[in-house]
Amino acid sequence: VGFKAGVKDYKLNYYTPDYETKDTDILAAFRVTPQPGVPPEEAGAAVAAESSTGTWTAVWTDGLTSLDRYKGRCYHIEPVAGEENQYIAYVAYPLDLFEEGSVTNMFTSIVGNVFGFKALRALRLEDLRIPPAYSKTFQGPPHGIQVERDKLNKYGRPLLGCTIKPKLGLSAKNYGRAVYECLRGGLDFTKDDENVNSQPFMRWRDRFLFCAEALYKAQAETGEIKGHYLNATAGTCEEMIKRAVFARELGVPIVMHDYLTGGFTANTSLAHYCRDNGLLLHIHRAMHAVIDRQKNHGIHFRVLAKALRMSGGDHIHAGTVVGKLEGERDITLGFVDLLRDDFVEKDRSRGIYFTQDWVSLPGVLPVASGGIHVWHMPALTEIFGDDSVLQFGGGTLGHPWGNAPGAVANRVALEACVRARNEGRDLAREGNEIIREAAKWSPELAAACEVWKAIKFEFPAMDTL
């Protein structure tokens, strides 16, 4: 019969160290911690098998297909330096295993099942190489960085934002007032907090109306294009699209979505709607730390970032390197480049395991947000460069004189940093001096400098190589 029942070692079929990877393969780098007594080759092969064609025992229907054509292969294993019993297992998946244009299906296949596997003590997906043959089946970001700049008519500097706080409990009218003050003071964007959806104290439609009013008023008074990220995240996809439609009817420039809690299917639907209707799409990564914070188990954020670029979003939160939230500098800049650039070289010192060629997929603006204030401005300008959104929530609304002066302080600080950089000054070394000079001409900035002169969030970064 050619069929032998029973349980076989995975490595007989799925560990293939002499395999030459194809240009069309999806490649994955897993950090594997095998259970005691399980050899690394067997653990790596088990991951390849369980995330592709394998199951725990030989089945006769294997004979009805070509395993060689469809199986995932563990083609290389290396020990992780400085860690006991941790290995990087490289797995190649044939392109045919995945549905075109579906991030949902890609994740269901690659990480859907293997993470509960008994032979592994822990498993983390560190990186994915998405071949152009697959990325070309995705629309990607609704607009991308250049189109966004053209829509907003803002060039040569990072964009400024502010999350409206307190995040929960304001009425729609008071919320709109805070939006107006921030935009009037000089910010480009204000933002719904990720958990502002449609609660009893502020229903979504009321918020959309008051925010649109605030936006148009600030626009008329400043002569600059303004935006407020209206959070369209909802309990059903239909309701989410309904909110996006209403935002479009109001004529506002941008909506927002929580892509991990909302889910990739909903996110991709919204991204398609946004491109078809000229809306920018801001993405918040609520829930990411549940998935990406543990060093030895889960999925690294650089994979979630790549997935978002495929699913679609024009902005995504990406850590600050300097504020209250997670992010080690080189690693953060690694996935910031993966979001913005067309082509990123493999660079293990930045956590990038594969060379990634995005071809013509539009880029995503990284958003730095969380515990940042005016004293951070030189560092942020230097680290993130022009193509970024810098968001100061408390760093705007916490200003002793109010929201609009808080916005003024941030705008003055940003313009000072950009100007100093363009004159060739070293922001890393002279940053504090640049802010102090600017504060002489701006009482709002001087007051902000005084309030936050001693604030530090000093904890070691968790996201290390």
Swiss-Prot record:
InterPro entries: RuBisCO, RuBisCo_large_chain_AS, RuBisCO_lsu_C, RuBisCO_lsu_C_sf, RuBisCO_lsu_fd_N, RuBisCO_lsu_N_sf, RuBisCO_lsuI. Keywords: Calvin cycle, Carbon dioxide fixation, Chloroplast, Disulfide bond, Lyase, Magnesium, Metal-binding, Methylation, Monooxygenase, Oxidoreductase, Photorespiration, Photosynthesis, Plastid. The modification N6,N6,N6-trimethyllysine is found at K4. This is Ribulose bisphosphate carboxylase large chain. PANTHER family: RIBULOSE BISPHOSPHATE CARBOXYLASE, RIBULOSE BISPHOSPHATE CARBOXYLASE LARGE CHAIN. Substrate binds at N113, T163, K167, R285, H317, S369. It is found in: Plastid, Chloroplast. Its EC number is 4.1.1.39. It comes from Eucommia ulmoides (Hardy rubber tree). The modification N6-carboxylysine is found at K191. It catalyses: 2 (2R)-3-phosphoglycerate + 2 H(+) = D-ribulose 1,5-bisphosphate + CO2 + H2O; D-ribulose 1,5-bisphosphate + O2 = 2-phosphoglycolate + (2R)-3-phosphoglycerate + 2 H(+).
